[in-house]
Amino acid sequence: MTAIGAQAHKLLGLKRPHRSFFESFIRTLIIVCTALAVVLSSVSICDGHWLLVEDHLFGLWYFCTIGNHSEPHCLRDLSQAHMPGLAVGMGLARSVAAMAVVAAIFGLEMLIVSQVCEDVRSRRKWAIGSYLLLVAFILSSGGLLTFIILLKNQINLLGFTLMFWCEFTASFLFFLNAASGLHINSLTQPWDPPAGTLAYRKRGYDGTSLI
C-alpha cells in the first residue's frame, strides 16, 4: 500500500471516541421523553377541551354547553360565550401552543440527527435542539397562562380536564429535557480530531471551515 493510500485509509478509519453507556442512556432518554412530550402536546391541542365548569366546557376551539340529558351543544364562535376577549385570547393561546409543538419537533429532529450522524458538529446540533426545546417550553407555558388568565373567574382546580394536564406535563417535559440536554452537553468533552488529519484541516486551528 502506498503512503497516500495508507494515509487515506487512516483518515477514513478515524472515528469519534466511544462514549460511555451512561451518557448514551441519558441522551436516548432525553430524546424519548421529548417525543412523548410532542405527542402529549399535539393531542391536547387537537382536542382542546381544557376546563369543565358546571355545565360549561371551555376549550381552545369550542365553547360547549352540557345539558342534563342531552348532547353537548358546542359553538365554534367563542364570541357567543358572552365573555369579552375570549375569542381573541383563545386564538392567541392555540397559536402559541401550536408554535410550541413546531419548535419542539424541530428540536427533536436536531437531537436525533446529532446522535445518528456523529461528527465534530454533533455537540452544536445537540445544543441547538436543546435551545429549541427551551423555546417550546416558553411558548407552551405562554399558551397555558393565556388560557388561565382568560378564564380566571371560572377556574376550579378540579375542573381542569385530562387534556389540560397533558399540556401541562408536556410543557414541564420540554423544560426538563432542555435543561438536561444543555447540562449533559456541558459535562461532556468536545471531540477534536487529531492534528494533521483531514477533519482537523477542514476545521482550521480556530474552528472555522477551510474547505
From Swiss-Prot:
Domain of life: Eukaryota
Topological relation to the membrane, as annotated: Multi-pass membrane protein
GO cellular component: monoatomic ion channel complex
The keyword Calcium is annotated on this UniProt entry: yes
Membrane-traversing stretches: 25-45, 96-116, 131-151, 155-175
Chief location: membrane
Protein localization: Membrane
Transit peptide found in the keyword field: no
UniProt KW keywords: Calcium, Calcium channel, Calcium transport, Ion channel, Ion transport, Membrane, Transmembrane, Transmembrane helix, Transport, Voltage-gated channel
Entry's Gene Ontology molecular function annotations: calcium channel activity; voltage-gated monoatomic ion channel activity
Physiological role: Thought to stabilize the calcium channel in an inactivated (closed) state. Modulates calcium current when coexpressed with CACNA1G.
Family under the similarity heading: Belongs to the PMP-22/EMP/MP20 family. CACNG subfamily.
Summary of subunit composition and partner proteins: The L-type calcium channel is composed of five subunits: alpha-1, alpha-2/delta, beta and gamma.
Protein name per the record: Voltage-dependent calcium channel gamma-like subunit
Organism of origin: Mus musculus
